């Protein structure tokens, strides 16, 4: 699925890898030319693992029911929360609890993995 017309975010909800396949996140990230790209890599029970390549900022949003886990592969990720900002370096992760207003941003090209419930639509709400 592509982003709606005029939306700067390229979001693909199709599951790229099936069970028993080697997941090659680096190959996908290296081939990415988008400033903001989100690809669902695989499904694990009721959750999905998504890879994002980002540069710039996302809009403020929250998920009313589900938590989100962010893990930085390369670059630096900033997660703005009400009242504070969390900065993540490579090999660091952070959980945003459901109901928490937040936005993600990166001042340089950054690759992250997200683990979240499969019901989350990664465009935020």
Language-model-detected regions and their locations in the chain:
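Glycine- and acidic-residue-biased ligand/ion/polar-headgroup-sensing regions
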Residues: 56, 65-78, 82-83
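A cytosolic small-molecule/anion-sensing beta-strand core signal
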Residues: 45, 73-74, 89-90, 108, ...
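Short beta-strand segments in beta-sandwich/barrel cores
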Residues: 49, 58-60, 75-80, 120
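Short strand-coil-strand connectors
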Residues: 45, 80-84, 107
